Regions:
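Residues that define the transmembrane beta-barrel architecture of outer-membrane proteins
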Residues: 2, 43-47, 58, 98-100, ...
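Residue-level signature of outer-membrane beta-barrel architecture
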Residues: 8-12, 41, 51-55, 108-109, ...
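Outer-membrane beta-barrel channels and translocator barrels
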Residues: 13, 44, 56-58, 99, ...
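Repeated loop/turn-to-beta-strand initiation elements of outer-membrane beta-barrel proteins
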Residues: 15-18, 57-62, 113-116, 153-158, ...
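Membrane-embedded beta-barrel scaffold of Gram-negative outer-membrane proteins
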Residues: 17-21, 42-102, 107-109, 116, ...
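Extracellular loop and loop/strand-boundary signature of outer-membrane beta-barrel proteins
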Residues: 31-39, 87-93, 101-103, 127-134, ...
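C-terminal beta-signal and adjacent terminal beta-strands/loops
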Residues: 70, 164-173, 191-239
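Gram-negative outer-membrane beta-barrel transporters
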Residues: 91-173, 211-214, 234-236
Length: 239
């Protein structure tokens, strides 16, 4: 299947440029309906436009974009079991889904030794009747990452990041009423330190989920908790 793409970039001046793009969507799915048949591929259109800036020879770059995604055959979870599937629940297709939102990202070298990245996304997704589509996916997310190389010990780099998302939920209708599973907003903090032993060899230590946040990653079904606080040590050699 061929998916057309078209894009246009206009340089406003030495620092600013504007762009617009269009992409056709064709995405096969691995979800099955109540008859056990795989859902038809997602089809639709993706429109995006925005502004980009570049300052001080790319030491600071920014991107601001708006987007609109029109889709048919979008999978949504149901509570109907698929016969003979050992407990697998069926999915249904939803047509006329429209997602629209805005994204912002800034990347900068604050100093020669200190880099930082910040990004945020906000969008809404509704079907042709105005109902929320897949509210189990976060509508707002924010990320911040930074790293710093110590001037006194240039082989040593430390850094970390924060990823935040808003609350998500899933409504399930049963003969006894409608029940809502919900995961509140949460932030995950990660840290790392890397030491460049030689030009080709480095070691790195990571602490993931620093504050040991408990969160559910699967409110569609049974509770699946995200990884608790964990520590890892890796070695890397580049030939």
């Amino acid at each position: 299947h061929t998916t057309p793409y078209a894009g246009l970039i206009y340089d406003i001046n030495d620092n600013w440029s504007a762009y617009a793009s269009y992409t056709s969507i064709f995405q096969p799915q691995n979800k099955r309906d109540k008859a056990g048949q795989y859902l038809a591929p997602i089809t639709g259109n993706n429109y995006e436009a925005g502004l980009k800036s570049d300052w001080m020879n790319s030491r600071l770059t920014t991107t601001l974009s708006v987007f609109r995604i029109e889709q048919n055959n979008v999978a949504q979870a149901t509570t109907i079991p698929i016969p003979g599937s050992n407990g697998e629940f069926a999915w249904k297709s939803t047509d006329g889904t429209v997602s629209k939102g805005v994204e912002f990202e800034v990347n900068g070298a604050i100093t020669d030794n200190w880099q930082m990245t910040f990004g945020a996304t906000r969008y809404v997704a509704e079907d042709n009747e105005g109902n929320a589509v897949n509210p189990n996916l976060p509508r707002t997310s924010v990320k911040l990452f930074t790293r710093y190389r110590l001037p006194a010990i240039p082989e040593l780099t430390v850094g970390g990041g924060v990823n935040w998302q808003n609350r998500v939920y899933k409504d399930t209708t049963t003969p006894y009423g409608t029940f809502r599973a919900e995961q509140g907003s949460y932030a995950l903090v990660d840290l790392f330190t890397r030491y460049q032993v030689t030009k080709n060899f480095s070691v790195q230590g990571n602490i993931n989920n620093l504050f040991d946040k408990t969160y559910d990653t699967n409110i569609d079904g049974s509770i699946v908790y995200g990884a608790p606080r964990n520590v890892s040590l890796t070695a890397n050699y580049q030939f």
